[in-house]
From Swiss-Prot:
One of its GO terms (cellular component) is extracellular region. It comes from Conus textile. This is Conotoxin TxMEKL-0422. Contains disulfide bonds. Keywords: Cleavage on pair of basic residues, Disulfide bond, Neurotoxin, Secreted, Toxin. It is found in: Secreted. Residues 21-35 have a biased composition (Basic and acidic residues). Expressed by the venom duct.
Amino acid sequence: NPASCCSCADVDPGRASRKTPKGEDQVFIKEKDRC
């Protein structure tokens, strides 16, 4: 599932910002081929 990728990304058009359990902002790459 591309949406659940856990690879961190720098500013990227395909990124998705999420909150970690600690409340920190974490960025994930959506494209599966970039995980």
